[in-house]
Structure formats: structure tokens, C-alpha cells
Amino acid sequence: LLNVIADAKTKVYGDADPSLTYQVSGLKNGDTAGSILTGGLNRATGENVGVYGINQGDLALNSGNYDLSYQGNNLTITKALLNVIADAKTKVYGDADPSLTYQVSGLKNGDTAGAVLNGGSLSRVAGENVGVY
């Protein structure tokens, strides 16, 4: 019996999938996994944060000397880091506040700041006297 156990994998949202690898036990007579197995693993479809099963795919034996036992595992997609940095603003005492704006970095997969931040806006600490807020 040839035992194949998929390795657990992780990736950050928006990054490329890691190689899906596995461990093999039960080889006999100097056989190697590369000479006994063909094909590769695949995973459940999805790119959002979550857990996706790693499946046997088309991994198969090319030797009649073994039976294959496969144990799957998971690919976990974790959240990406999104950086939001407020732009520095100034105003003259007594004038209206300027528009508060920000810069965003770390967006992935074609996401936009408006969609990810749900149209969020900035606010400032209350105060009108001369100073830093």
C-alpha cells in the first residue's frame, strides 16, 4: 500500500497558489515516488479568504505493484494587508476644513479602494484653535 498525504498549504489573498506537494510512505525495493506516481494534486476552486480542500487531482500510480491510499489536506487563504495612509492637510484658522483624502496600497485581484473600504471616509479630531489635529 502506497500512502500519499497532501501537505497543508497557505497563501495570502491575491498571491499565486503555492506548489501542491505531498509525502509518500510505503515504497518498496528502492522505488521512488517519481517513478511510481504520475500527475499532480489540485484544489477546490476559489480565491477569497477561506479554506479549500486539496484533492488527489490526476495523481495516479503507474505501477501495478501498489495500491494507492490518498489523504487530502487544505489550502488556507489568509487576508492580505491593506495600507490606508491619510494625506496631510492644512487650513487657515476660520476657514472650512479641506477635503480629507488618503492613499491606499496593497490592493489585489483588481479590487478597488472604494469597493474594499465600502466608500469609507475620513474624519478628524474636533477642534478649531491653531494646532495639530
For each of these PLM feature ranges, what is it?
Residues 1-133:
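Solvent-exposed beta-strand/loop surfaces, strongest in extracytoplasmic domains of secreted
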